[in-house]
Amino acid sequence: DSGGKFVIEEKFVGEEFSLMSFCDGKSLKHMPIVQDHKRAYEGDSGPNTGGMGTYTDSNHLLPFLNTDDVNEAKMINEATINALRDKYDDKYKGILYGGFMATRDGVKLIEYNARFGDPEAMNVLSLLKTDFIDICFGITNCELDKIQVQFKKQATVCKYTVPEGYPDNPIKGQSININNITNPDQLYYASVDIENGQLIESGSRTMAVVGMADTISEAEVFAEREVSSIIG
């Protein structure tokens, strides 16, 4: 309409990735880079979800990123924390979860969250070698710079199971059988209930499995095998 208002948005074309960092208000310790896949169906099709699966590589980069891309994302996270402290006197403590896109014009920041990503957290925390409690104390006491945060040099693939019809019209109340899972330590519960001692799907992402191996392809094979063994 003549005289109306409109918004111009810049379109970015590239590959998205996530960089999460532990923050104590002055120091940051970065976690491995993760890529999330949000489309509900095979072949990156269907509606968006909270995240159907994620992966990391053994070198803590991703196949489509180079070292300069990762360093640029780290610098953006660091600049954000420094600006909060220096300009607004806000020493942010916790998890800084940056959503980025690698484009032909460089790395672009898409969004921030003040929390772990789901499912990204399951990838990076599965790789964490340092005691998580020590990291938490380092954050609260502003002594994160004294802690050597280390991660295993392995690849991970995380896959979610979801109810039939998810996300638009999920069927609720279906029973779940996990007796065939071979590594329950890498099974993570999400939207499930218990009725009469039986696990029940409650409508959203149900549970996730993380596969760890030397390569992404090997980790994917393990995650797929475990997910396929869940009956429900």
Where are the model-predicted features located?
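Short beta-strand/turn micro-motifs at beta-sheet edges
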Residues: 41-43, 146-148, 193-199
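Short arginine-rich
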Residues: 3-4, 84, 225-232
